[in-house]
A protein has these predicted regions:
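A short, charge-rich alpha-helical start-of-domain segment used by transcription regulators
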Residues: 1-21, 31-34, 45
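Sigma70-family region 2
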Residues: 2, 38-56, 75-76
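Short, aromatic/basic-enriched loop-to-helix "N-cap" motif that marks the start
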Residues: 17, 47-64, 143
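Structural recognition of an alpha-helix C-terminal capping motif at a helix-to-coil junction
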Residues: 21, 35-42, 55-67
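Arg/Lys-rich amphipathic alpha helix in sigma70-family domain 2
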Residues: 49-52, 62-84, 100, 152
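Internal acidic/polar
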Residues: 71, 79-108, 131, 170-174
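A short pre-motif secondary-structure segment
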Residues: 121-125
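DNA-recognition helix of helix-turn-helix
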Residues: 139-163
């Protein structure tokens, strides 16, 4: 545990929102995002005293959350769960679309359709304002890989968005 409760509360207050947004972007599930965020803070509470440099708490939290996400994803791949009742699909709550512009909605949809390494890199850079160096530490890859994933991810996103606009134009003409 950090040296006192106020330090821990300060870290939670400072990083809960961006950490949760990152988890939500990765998992696409509010429940999973909340679990991942809580687990990251639990581990921080247990191991913060072992951090040599307390200024690295932010990077440590994002790295821990990302690794937990990957571990959960591997587990879910090996042990897929089956739905007990298909009527639960009707009860899934979606984000209120009226509050999100059509462009933002299309961008989020395109982002979620991207492959994992590109999605997480774009989320960390644009949604959480991490530097290349911080992203490299969080994802455990070289800075050059981060730069490459950002460039390729932006191009993929641009292509998906252009295709979506073209499809919408075709539908509007019909």
């Amino acid at each position: 545990m950090p040296s006192d409760d106020t330090e821990f509360e300060a870290v939670v207050t400072a990083y809960y929102e961006p950490l949760y947004r990152f988890a939500l972007g990765l998992s696409r599930s509010e429940a999973d995002a909340a679990d991942l965020t809580q687990r990251a803070f639990e581990r921080f509470g247990e191991k913060a005293g072992t951090l040599r440099d307390q200024s690295k708490a932010k990077t440590w939290l994002f790295t821990t959350l990302y690794r937990d996400f990957l571990q959960q994803k591997r587990h879910d791949t090996r042990f897929p769960h089956a739905e007990l009742d298909e009527t639960f699909d009707d009860k899934i709550v979606e984000m209120p679309r009226a509050e999100i512009s059509a462009d933002a909605n299309a961008a989020v949809t395109a982002l979620h359709a991207m492959g994992e390494p590109f999605r997480s890199t774009l989320l960390l850079f644009y949604m959480n304002d991490h530097s290349y160096k911080e992203i490299a530490e969080i994802l455990g890859v070289p800075i050059g890989t981060v730069m490459s994933r950002l460039a390729r991810g932006k191009e993929m996103l641009r292509t998906k968005m252009t295709d979506a606009v073209n499809d919408a134009d075709k539908e509007a003409r019909v």
